[in-house]
Amino acid sequence: LCDIGGSSMELAVIADGKVGKRMTAPLGPLRLEGIKGGKKGRKAEIDRNLDRLVDVVGTGHKRLFLVGGSWRAIARLDMERREDPLHVLHEYRMTPRSVVATVKWIADNDLTELRGRTDTSEARMSLVPVASEVLRRLVRRLRPAEIAVSAYGIREGMLYEQMPDRLRRRDPLIEACRFAEAKDARMPGFGKALFGFLRPLYANARPARLRLVKAACLLHDVTWRAHPDYRHEVCFDNATRANLGGLTHSERVFLGLALLHRYKNSRSGTRFEPLMELLNAQQLKDAEILGKAMRFGAMFSVQDSSMMGAMTWKPVKKVLVMQVPKASRALFGEVAAARFQSLASSLGAEGNVTFLK
C-alpha cells in the first residue's frame, strides 16, 4: 500500500489482514516542488529515497494499492486517456504499462485542458506532474503485477480502527447489499432464500462468483419503486455507480448486468452497451443466466422458503429440472413456465417441470 500526502509518502506491506514492513519518505509533491536543480534534482531525490524504500518493502508484489488525492487524480486521468466508460475510482485497476503511458500523456498535454476534462481542482492538478514522476519511478522500482486505486482515506481508516474484529471480517459487499435489502426491498430476507434456491446452478462455482450471485440476490428487489419501464436501468445504475466496496470494475458491470436481466430479457439497445466491453463473452452470458434465474425465482416470493420448490441442474446432460411443491402449484402459471424455459434456454438445456403431490 502506498499513501501519498503533500510532504511525504508511506509504503506498507499488507498480508493476511496485517500490516507488515513499512517505511516513510519525504516524497510528497509539495516538498519535491521545492527541491533545487529542477527536474534533474527531483529525479535524484526520488531515486535516493526509493532505494531506501525498496530495501525495506521489497519488490514484485501482487498488487500496489494507491491511497491519496494525487494518486486518485492520476487514476482519473488514466481513465480519461483510456476512455474508460465507468468513472468509479475505488478499485480501479491499472497495469504498470498503463501508468507509464498515462504519465507520458499527462506531460504531453495542457494541464488546464485536462483539468476541465476530468473536473479536477486547480490545486490538485498543479501537483499531478510531480506526483506523476514519483509514481512512474515507484512502479518501475517496485514492479507490481497491477495497481489498484483506493477511494478510502483517513476517515475510513479511523472507522475501521474502531470496529471489533468480528465486523472487520465481514465482506463489505455483502454487508452493503444486506443493508440495502433491509432498507428498500419489499420482502427483506427473501434474498437469502433466493440465493439458496439458485445455489444448485452454482454447485461448482468459485467463491468469487458465489459472492456476486449472493450480492445480486440481496439486491434483486431494492429498486421495485422505479417505473417498470425503467427499472432495469435503475438496477444497472445502482450496481455500477453506487458506493459499494469490494468490487472491481468488471464485477460491478457483471452485477449490474445480472440485475438488468432480472427485469429485462434483452440488453441490446440500452445506453449501457459501452460498459459491456468490460466483460468477455462468457461473463456476459453468465450475467444473463443469473439475471434470468433471479427473474424466475422471484416469482416464488413467499414467506416460507420451503414453498419455493427446488431446482436440479445436470450440466453434463444439459437438463434443468424444477420440482414444484403442491402448495406452490398455483404460482407456477404461464408466466412462470415461460421464465423457466427462458432460463433453461440460456443454459443451453432442456427444461423439465415436476409437480409434487
For the regions a language model picked out, list residue spans one by one.
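C-terminal accessory domains/tails appended to large, multi-domain proteins
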Residues: A336-F340, S346-A349
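Extended, folded domain segments that form the structural surfaces/walls around functional sites
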Residues: D3, K314, E350-N352
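Helical "lid/coupling" subdomains associated with nucleotide-phosphate turnover
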Residues: V13-D304, G309-M322, A330, V335, ...
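A short amphipathic beta-strand at an alpha->beta junction
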Residues: L347-K357
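Short glycine/serine/threonine-rich phosphate/pyrophosphate-binding segments
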Residues: I4-E10
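Glycine-rich, histidine-containing beta strand-loop boundary motifs that form or position
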Residues: D3-I4, A151
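Short glycine-aspartate micro-motif
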Residues: L1-D3, L64
